[in-house]
Regions:
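Short, low-complexity, Pro/Ser/Thr/Gly-rich segments in the mature regions of secreted, periplasmic
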Residues: 141-156
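A structural detector for beta-sheet-dominated domains
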Residues: 24, 51-55, 63-65, 69-71, ...
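N-terminal prepro-regions of secreted/extracellular proteins
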Residues: 1-40
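Membrane-insertion modules used to breach or fuse lipid bilayers
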Residues: 44-105
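Residue-level signal for mature regions of secreted extracellular proteins and peptides
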Residues: 3-6, 61-63, 123-124
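Low-complexity, intrinsically disordered short peptide segments enriched in small/polar/basic residues
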Residues: 14-20, 28, 47, 106, ...
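Intrinsic disorder/low-complexity segments enriched in polar/charged and small flexible residues
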Residues: 37, 116, 122, 151-154
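Membrane pore-forming effector domains from diverse proteins
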Residues: 88-140
């Protein structure tokens, strides 16, 4: 019986690659605060002024398929997208904002963070250690230190 030589291309003896994460896409995304007193609607027409003093936390989300570490994904996002990204931010809202509303329109204001929506993937060695394979994917909506009011109008 003869053994396959070490240079046999049908064998892969490489070391297993430690699983790692990659950010596969990003876009700007408004992460709204979800506590009472930070979302307003007024109209039709005129102007709206909001003033609020509130403390709370704006929290991001990480979702996906397969096994993954939200902390590792957030750490990767901090190094490849923006150092100001975090899982959550504790904030104190305390300012006044005024905006004109278009005729026959309703104005909406929502406080939150100008953050990012990310796509991510987790990679690892294939079972035969010949290839790198994607083992998990998902999305994350993460806040940054940039906070403020988002304004939009609707017909009703």
């Amino acid at each position: 019986m003869t053994e396959a030589p070490h240079n046999d291309p049908s064998r892969c003896d490489g070391p297993a690659i430690k699983p790692y994460y990659g950010i596969t896409g990003k876009s700007s995304y408004f992460v709204p605060s979800l506590w009472n007193g930070t979302e307003y609607k007024d109209g039709p027409g005129g102007s709206m002024t909001v003033s609020v003093t509130k403390t709370g936390t704006i929290t991001g989300t990480v979702t996906g398929s397969g096994e993954f570490s939200a902390g590792a994904i957030i750490a990767k996002a901090k190094t490849t997208v923006s150092v100001s990204i975090a899982a959550s931010f504790a904030i104190a809202v305390g300012h006044t904002y005024t905006h004109d509303i278009g005729k026959k329109k309703y104005g909406h204001l929502q406080y939150g963070s100008w953050g990012y929506k990310l796509s991510w993937a987790k990679y690892a060695s294939s079972a035969d250690r010949c290839h790198i394979v994607k083992v998990s994917t998902g999305t994350a909506k993460l806040p940054t230190k940039s906070m403020g009011w988002k304004y939009w109008e609707t017909a009703s």
